[in-house]
């Protein structure tokens, strides 16, 4: 049976992650309170950020920026702003 969590991003019970994907205390917080669906949404935003801002994960400042954006997105309800990006309309 799938593990469920109360997802802080979706504000509802949802299927939890299978294992801790991020190290440290932040990783534990993500594992305990972020759903698979919310994590997938973050991964899309992360990919856009890395590509559009040309982030280098070998650079500590870039990793710190990405981590802060992740916290803002998953826990503080702030959307990721990517200059020049216009979401598609349905």
UniProtKB/Swiss-Prot annotation:
UniProt keyword annotation of Iron present: yes
SUPFAM superfamilies: YggX-like (SSF111148)
Sorted UniProt keywords: Iron
GO MF: iron ion binding
Keyword Iron attributed: yes
Record-linked InterPro entries: Fe_traffick_prot_YggX, Fe_traffick_prot_YggX_sf
GO cellular component, one term: cytosol
One Pfam family in the UniProt entry: Iron_traffic
Record function comment: Could be a mediator in iron transactions between iron acquisition and iron-requiring processes, such as synthesis and/or repair of Fe-S clusters in biosynthetic enzymes.
Name this polypeptide is given: Probable Fe(2+)-trafficking protein
Organism encoding this protein: Pasteurella multocida (strain Pm70)
């Amino acid at each position: 049976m799938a593990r469920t969590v109360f997802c802080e991003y979706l504000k509802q019970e949802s299927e939890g992650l299978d294992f801790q994907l991020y190290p440290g205390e932040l990783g534990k917080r993500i594992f305990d309170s972020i759903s698979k669906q919310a994590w997938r949404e973050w991964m899309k935003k992360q990919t856009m950020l890395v590509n559009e801002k040309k982030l280098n994960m070998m650079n500590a400042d870039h990793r710190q920026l990405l981590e802060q954006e992740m916290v803002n997105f998953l826990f503080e309800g702030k959307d990721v702003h990517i200059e020049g990006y216009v979401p598609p309309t349905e």
